[in-house]
Amino acid sequence: MKALLLDKAGPVSSLYVGDLPVPEPGAGEIRVKVHAVSLNPVDYKLAGRGNENWKWPHVLGLDVAGVVDAVGEGANQWSTGDRVFYHGDLSKAGGFAEYAITTAHTTARIPDGVGFAEAAAIPCAGLTAYEAVVRRLNVQPDHIVWMQGGAGGVGGFAVQMCANIGAAVITTASERNHEYVKSLGASYAIDYANEDVVARIMEITKGRGVDRVLAAVDEATADQGIEVLAFRGGLATVAGLPQLAESTFDNARSVHRIAYGGAHTSSNREAQVDLALMAEEMIALVAEKTIDPMIEQVIGLGDIPAGLAQLETRHVRGKIVAELV
């Protein structure tokens, strides 16, 4: 099979298209004929540092959509021909290939009317946003929420979810993306490059601060998130933990860390099954046209290194998806 290969940890420019044997599913696993994969920042980060459990050459790619091609022993909930998608285990071979292996219990079904590219765009960014907005932050209609990086994958999904709930959404984005994030549901867009973000948020909220923050950029913006949280506010972070001062706890603020890699590496089956449950809930929203998967670019397998290099600039709007079929 054709696959995008990495011979050793290094820059995305070292990725190349090569040949590998078609893998066979083990007990509790299925083989998927890959139709589409989406690109995520975690892909270039993993390429750069590697993983002690990888076998070389390694195949990256965590967000996969395709058709069940073979079923391993005990994976009887799936049949060949089923349309599926999943968020993969970063310690194992991924989906930047014509065929991929995944665990049956972490896999979700693609409903009629949803394409493979749309499904592939969901897992990493969509599940992160869902976990933060719905599970951890419990965003309510009367909340004011700061969703950082609203033009990106995680931020874009989160902006839409909060707007659908009825919350007022403030987001940060470059000026060229202001109309875009407002089209997703943001009430206010702040130019992080040319405005004092903290001062602008406090102006918008009349000094009160926001009820919820999703820190999706870096540790510095996570620190800003703590700074603008109102009394009993909550922050969820995927970008590193903020510095926590005593005042954080004096104001009864809470901090939540989102990390999906742990669901696989912890051997916590309940958490792994939950990946599939959340994926089913997310793709139902896409099927209902309640959530837009925000596909901005569709590329081929050989274009993935260039796509990942784009992601490294942190100036990509929405999602990049590679179609293999």
What are these regions (language model features)?
Residues 283, 287-297, 305-325:
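C-terminal capping/lid region of NAD(P)-dependent oxidoreductase domains
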Residues 247-297:
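C-terminal substrate-binding/catalytic core of Rossmann-like NAD(P)-dependent dehydrogenases/reductases
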Residues 48, 73-74, 171-180, 219-221:
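Short glycine/proline-centered loop/turn elements that form peptide/ligand docking sites
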Residues 21-38, 48-91:
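Glycine-rich beta-strand-centered segment in the early N-terminal region that forms part
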Residues 189-258:
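Glycine-rich cofactor phosphate-binding loops and adjacent beta1-alpha1 units
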Residues 82-83, 99, 144, 164, ...:
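Residue-level marker of beta-strand positions
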Residues 120-194:
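Mid-domain Rossmann-like dinucleotide-binding core that forms the NAD(H)/NADP(H) cofactor-binding site
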Residues 77, 87-149:
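NAD(P)H dinucleotide-binding glycine-rich loop of Rossmann-like/cofactor-binding domains
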